Regions:
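Hydrophobic alpha-helical core bundles mediating ligand binding, dimerization, or RNAP-core interactions
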Residues: 10, 14-17, 29, 37, ...
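Short, low-complexity N-terminal intrinsically disordered segments enriched in polar/charged residues
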Residues: 1-31, 137-147
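A solvent-exposed, acidic/Ser-Thr-rich amphipathic alpha-helical stretch
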Residues: 5, 24, 30-81
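Hydrophobic pocket/interface hotspot
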Residues: 10-13, 25-26, 33, 52, ...
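A beta-strand edge to alpha-helix "cap/lid" segment located at domain peripheries
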Residues: 1-5, 64-147
Length: 147
């Protein structure tokens, strides 16, 4: 039963984050929430390591500031005890030029006393950076002209 409840809690939190209800999402997190999303923060400033509601609020707000539309599709979700893993396909529309970025991510949620206490996120950052910069980094790194 705890598994199905935590599964639904994650889906509710994701719905709130993607809809822009950041305060509603944060209310479902512990005060000392720990969010880890390894990535080059010079290009993806909302990624990295964030501790506490204030830092996570700033992270989620940065994502909304950069994108005019956000949505996701759940590819898979697994819950066991106080942990939930979810595989998402994410679609973000850049506010600057209307281009749509699409990528897959895996997120791992830990719960304490019914609230999210930790989120670990894994993304193919090479692909995401290419989409953010709108450049073929493979060609650049290999010395080939970009297509």
């Amino acid at each position: 039963m705890a598994e199905s409840l935590n599964r639904q809690r994650v889906l509710n939190l994701l719905d709130m984050v993607y809809a822009g209800d950041i305060e509603g999402a944060l209310a479902r997190c512990t005060e000392d929430i720990d969010y880890l999303a390894p990535a080059p923060i010079e290009i993806l400033p909302h990624m990295g390591h964030h501790r506490g509601r204030d830092e996570v609020r700033a992270q989620w707000q940065t994502v909304h500031d950069r994108h005019s539309q956000m949505r996701y599709e759940v590819r898979a979700i697994v819950a066991e005890g106080d942990a939930v893993a979810v595989h998402l396909r994410v679609f973000l529309t850049k506010r600057s030029n209307g281009r749509i970025m699409q990528f897959d991510t895996a997120m791992f949620f830990s719960f304490r006393d019914g609230r999210v206490s930790r989120i670990s996120q894994i993304i193919d950052t090479f692909d995401l950076v290419q989409q953010v910069l709108e450049r073929d980094l493979s060609a650049l790194l290999m010395g080939s002209p970009s297509l």
